[in-house]
């Protein structure tokens, strides 16, 4: 696979110790990468750099042109219908038809003319995913998009995101605090701590993945230990 993202020596600070301390990162086309780390470890800062929302010096910073971000909050415009939110900023003549297809992909075609304030949390996040997909991103950036959802909705969203990734095949970077979520979805898991990557694990388990799988259990224990959490089954 070709490296879609290639970053060398990326550094970011805000007047104190470096949040990102000369890190190197590659993400291949179509690869699903999960990024774990404690609060304040720089995960969201890195995602913002990848999204072009923050500048940071680097020896090399190669990013694809087509990038989309889904944040923890859906950030829908309440005065626009769902479909108008999805097409916001899209200049193509066929924007409406592409948005309709994207809403169908996320299971929300029946709510395309609804107002955002009438959506459930899961529906609003589906709309945010459709808005990201309509731009046909080469790189999809997910900044803890399931954190505010209840447990059952989170599980459903995991399945949806995996299916969308399989269909559209963007490279994905998922920022999360949830080790199980990372193991369920990602090809590769990175741990960020002290401004550097301290752990990299490739996950070769077949999908659908089960947390009870011995290899998943081993990876979970290794990641929790790296994050300073004692595994419950240890």
Task: Annotate the PLM regions.
Residues 140-143:
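Catalytic Walker B motif of ABC-type/P-loop ATPase nucleotide-binding domains
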Residues 36-38:
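The feature captures the beta-strand-to-loop junction immediately N-terminal to the Walker
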Residues 134-138:
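A short, proline-enriched helix->beta-strand linker immediately N-terminal to the Walker B motif
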Residues 5, 20-22:
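Conserved structural motif at the start of ABC-family nucleotide-binding domains
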Residues 51:
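Helix-to-loop junction immediately C-terminal to a conserved catalytic motif
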Residues 115-119, 123:
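Conserved ABC ATPase signature
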Residues 129:
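Hydrophobic anchor residue at the start of the ABC signature
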């Amino acid at each position: 696979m070709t490296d879609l993202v290639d970053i060398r020596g990326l550094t970011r600070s805000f007047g104190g110790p470096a949040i990102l301390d000369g890190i190197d990162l590659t993400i291949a086309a179509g690869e699903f990468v999960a990024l774990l780390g404690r609060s304040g470890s720089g995960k969201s800062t890195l995602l913002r750099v990848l999204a072009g929302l923050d500048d940071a010096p680097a020896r090399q910073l190669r990013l694809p042109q087509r990038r989309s971000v889904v944040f923890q909050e859906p950030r829908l415009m309440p005065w626009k219908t769902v479909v108008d939110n999805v097409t916001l900023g899209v200049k193509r003549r066929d924007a409406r038809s592409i948005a309709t297809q994207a809403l169908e992909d996320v299971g929300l075609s029946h709510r395309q003319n609804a107002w955002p304030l009438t959506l459930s949390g899961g529906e609003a996040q589906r709309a945010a995913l459709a808005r990201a997909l309509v731009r046909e991103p080469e790189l999809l950036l997910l900044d803890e998009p399931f954190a505010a959802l209840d447990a059952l909705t989170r599980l459903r969203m995991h399945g949806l995101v995996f299916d969308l990734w399989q269909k559209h095949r963007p490279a994905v970077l998922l920022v999360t605090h949830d080790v199980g979520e990372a193991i369920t979805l990602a090809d590769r898991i990175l741990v960020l701590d002290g401004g550097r990557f301290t752990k990299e694990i490739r996950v070769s388990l077949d999908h659908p993945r089960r947390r009870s799988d011995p290899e998943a259990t081993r990876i979970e224990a290794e990641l929790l230990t790296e994050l300073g959490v004692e595994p419950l089954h240890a």
